[in-house]
Amino acid sequence: MERTFLMIKPDAVQRNLIGEVISRIERKGLKLVGGKLMQVPMELAETHYGEHQGKPFYNDLISFITSAPVFAMVVEGEDAVNVSRHIIGSTNPSEASPGSIRGDLGLTVGRNIIHGSDSLESAEREINLWFNENEITSYASPRDAWLYE
């Protein structure tokens, strides 16, 4: 089963949308196997967004992601990266499909509710960056028989 990293950003946490976002993810058949509400340390933010260092928006991005708690999570399911990317929607909420998390709940590119890994490689890197092994669990769910052939 594939795993991916998702992070509900400070704007969604402050708007009390954690439950709404998780519910949408679970309704699509993905299973939450790790999660934590946390204040992001500066060093973690800089490492996570290191690829954007030197870009004009980098400092604002780091300030935003460390400004309030986030809900970091690991979800599991068949084709989890692609399924979660589809549920999340386009980076720019005004271009995101209705029914997607960003299309329905996002306000601007900078306040777009959620981060999701964009590849299996990114998912593995981000999961290892944000979680220790003992913070992720595996479990069987009766619904699995109804979700997967």
UniProtKB/Swiss-Prot annotation:
List where in the cell it is found. Answer: Cytoplasm
Question: PROSITE patterns given for it?
Answer: NDPK, NDPK_LIKE
- Enzyme Commission identifier(s): 2.7.4.6
Q: What class of enzyme is it?
A: transferase
Q: Which purpose does this protein serve, as stated in its record?
A: Major role in the synthesis of nucleoside triphosphates other than ATP. The ATP gamma phosphate is transferred to the NDP beta phosphate via a ping-pong mechanism, using a phosphorylated active-site intermediate.
Q: Subunit details for this protein?
A: Homotetramer.
Please give the name of this protein: Nucleoside diphosphate kinase
| Source organism per UniProt | Staphylococcus aureus (strain COL)
